[in-house]
Amino acid sequence: MTKDRFGFFLVTGGSRGIGAACALRAARDWPVAIFYRERTEEAHQVVRTIECAGGTAVAIQADVGDEDSLMRGFEALDKVGPLAVLVNNAGVTGGVSRVDTLSASALQEVYRVNVIGAFLAAREAVRRMSTQHSGQGGAIVNISSGASVLGSPNNWVHYAASKGAIDTMTIGLSKEVAAEGIRVNAVRPGLIDTELQRGRSAEQLQKMISVVPLGRMGTVEEIAEAVVWLASPAAGYVTGCLLDARGGL
């Protein structure tokens, strides 16, 4: 692990998928913390994998959409070390639904986690990293979605709209904290080979892949590389960026 990176690289929803891939990739350069809600064994397996490779990692139970739970998570992290990077990855889709069959409870859960959770985590990150709060600066990388651009009709417009909120937050917050040593960017993944997509039929997947110019699904490792680059000093002049990783779609 490189020793010149100050502070922890925190990934919310870091127990699987894109979040786990971000944690594993970041561990080459930073000590890593992951917040998880329910998947205890998966979260600790990520930690073990990092430690076996010579890195430093900690898993902390925290529900980002529950302010009290999230605050306890950040307080636990404070005892371990300072924060350098926040990756706002935790999210839910709310299930496939047209708007005319969407339940209020599904909509509320999507916005509780995807929007409120991301804002609360960003708030706590700014409080710790901002030079106005005696911090040393840092980076926030939000995991948005290509759905925010495409809208996901007949699938999950509600989820797409929540990611549209993340895009707007990324742009606004990047300007708000630019003079305080914090860069804020987002990655917008497209069709990625995750547990979510593996639940689809082969016919469904092929239909989705057929419209991707690169002709395949992306990998979680490819998304992690984009996230780590945005968080790193190599992207030191990049802020307010919405980086599309959608295979050309």
Please tell me what each predicted stretch does:
Residues 97-99, 103-111, 197, 204, ...:
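Substrate-binding pocket helix/loop in short-chain dehydrogenase/reductase
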Residues 145:
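Residue(s) in the substrate-gating loop at a strand-loop-helix junction
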Residues 127, 175-176, 236:
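Alpha-helical segment proximal to the catalytic Tyr-Lys
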Residues 122, 162:
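Active-site helix of classical SDR
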Residues 178, 183, 238-240:
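Short, small/polar-rich loop/turn modules that mediate ligand/substrate recognition or access, typified
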Residues 15-16:
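Conserved glycine-rich cofactor-binding loop
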Residues 216-245:
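C-terminal substrate-recognition "lid" of short-chain dehydrogenase/reductases
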